[in-house]
Amino acid sequence: MYLSKVIIARAWSRDLYQLHQGLWHLFPNRPDAARDFLFHVEKRNTPEGCHVLLQSAQMPVSTAVATVIKTKQVEFQLQVGVPLYFRLRANPIKTILDNQKRLDSKGNIKRCRVPLIKEAEQIAWLQRKLGNAARVEDVHPISERPQYFSGDGKSGKIQTVCFEGVLTINDAPALIDLVQQGIGPAKSMGCGLLSLAPL
């Protein structure tokens, strides 16, 4: 697995959908590949473009669209019981029935995704997503401004939350799987990358 600092050209970083498309340019000659990278926007709207932290299964290659500033290969050696600092930008949501009673193609009432607004609900969502892999010891969720996107004839917004805190490892292989797969929805919109560091 690779961790990279990347700058996406301004023309490709106007919204999250474009940014995601720009990141694909770092992995040429893979037109049919499934997405095997996660990212976290660190700085937007700088003169050179958008600064991104990228986690990927393949080593990224600089292009005219995206420049790789720094890359390092990462191998996790996690131990049960060890506390770690963590950071996660996520899209904590719940699914509810459409209050306007609109129907889907099967005649069932549509389900809608809505953001979790209350801090206690956000923390409970995070612990559910971590499952038995880790226990949250301390966390500070910070609700961010809505993120807007458009592409493929669709547009929308997501409500992101930045979680920062301390967790304790319960199941090292399960936690590594979560790091590699990402946590929660909207991974193509810059959510789900779980960063870990020693205390």
Swiss-Prot record:
One of its GO terms (cellular component) is protein-containing complex. It holds the Pfam family CRISPR_assoc. Changing residue 20 to A: Loss of pre-crRNA cleavage. Transmembrane segments: none annotated. Its EC number is 3.1.-.-. The keyword RNA-binding applies. It is an enzyme of class 3 (hydrolase). GO terms for molecular function: RNA binding; RNA endonuclease activity. Induction: Repressed by H-NS, activated by LeuO. Activated by the BaeSR two-component regulatory system, possibly due to envelope stress. Part of the casABCDE-ygbT-ygbF operon. CRISPR (clustered regularly interspaced short palindromic repeat), is an adaptive immune system that provides protection against mobile genetic elements (viruses, transposable elements and conjugative plasmids). CRISPR clusters contain sequences complementary to antecedent mobile elements and target invading nucleic acids. CRISPR clusters are transcribed and processed into CRISPR RNA (crRNA). This is CRISPR system Cascade subunit CasE. The lineage of its organism: Bacteria, Pseudomonadati, Pseudomonadota, Gammaproteobacteria, Enterobacterales.
